[in-house]
A protein has these predicted regions:
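Stable alpha-helical structural segments in soluble proteins, enriched in small hydrophobic residues
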Residues: 3, 10, 69, 110, ...
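Short beta-strand scaffold segments in enzyme catalytic cores
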Residues: 84-91
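Mobile, glycine- and charge-enriched loop segments
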Residues: 111-141
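Short, glycine-anchored, charge-dense loop/turn motifs used at functional sites
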Residues: 92-96
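Short linear motifs in low-complexity or flexible loops
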Residues: 3, 7-22, 27, 37-38
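Zinc-dependent deaminase
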Residues: 46-78, 140-204
Length: 204
């Protein structure tokens, strides 16, 4: 679970008197703190208890930006050959850039539009977050690079979306590919209904 980034918090209780076997030289057992974790230690009943937060609580911020991305998706002109999607690029310095499907080009996806605006403004995208109303595509026919590849190429640290892409046009594996590459991927299905409304022209 730790290696796959599937845990937000880890709590470990260790008896400080516990030692390893002779083959380990009788070394005292210690809890290895995960890299990047913020830990609080306390002593409870003679046990050394470490509570480590692996990922910060970003729910409020995520929902705010993701709600904005869903609203951007409603600005799309409906098409029978593509989804109406909205996206927001959020930088650590507080700046953000929005985009929606086909905003400036009939082949551009929402993520492309938002990323292009950020780059035009001279933004450094490595370590930034991108919010998309729908899972970033992992393959496409209209352009040589998928949104998942674009996100990885620019070094985004986090990807947040509301709805997994249905298998209507292609079989999307964007979230899986991003997670395997070490990107922090979070999904908020409570906002998915707004994405479905934006794509009602395609049916359920």
């Amino acid at each position: 679970f730790l290696a796959e980034g599937m845990a937000d918090t880890v709590r470990r209780a260790v008896n400080p008197q516990l030692t390893l076997g002779p083959e380990r030289g009788g070394a005292q057992f210690r809890f290895e703190v995960p890299e990047g974790a913020v830990c609080r230690r306390e002593n409870l009943g003679g046990m050394e208890v470490a509570t480590c937060t692996l990922r910060p609580d970003t729910r409020d911020e995520d929902l705010r930006y993701l709600t904005q991305a869903v609203a951007e998706g409603l600005r799309c002109v409906p098409s029978r050959t593509s989804y109406c999607v909205g996206a927001v690029v959020a930088l650590p310095d507080g700046r953000s850039f929005t985009g929606y499907t086909h905003e400036t080009s009939p082949t551009h996806h929402a993520e492309q539009e938002a990323i292009r605006k950020a780059l035009d403004a001279g933004a450094e995208l490595r370590g930034a977050a991108i919010y998309s109303s729908m899972e970033p595509c992992s393959q496409r026919k209209s352009e040589p690079e998928s949104c998942t590849q674009l996100i990885l190429r620019h070094g985004f640290a986090r990807v947040v979306f509301a709805l997994y892409e249905p298998d209507r046009f292609v079989c999307c594996r964007g979230a899986q590919t991003l997670r395997e590459a070490g990107v922090d991927v979070r999904v908020y299905p409570e906002l998915a209904e707004g994405v479905r409304r934006a794509n009602a022209h395609l049916g359920r």
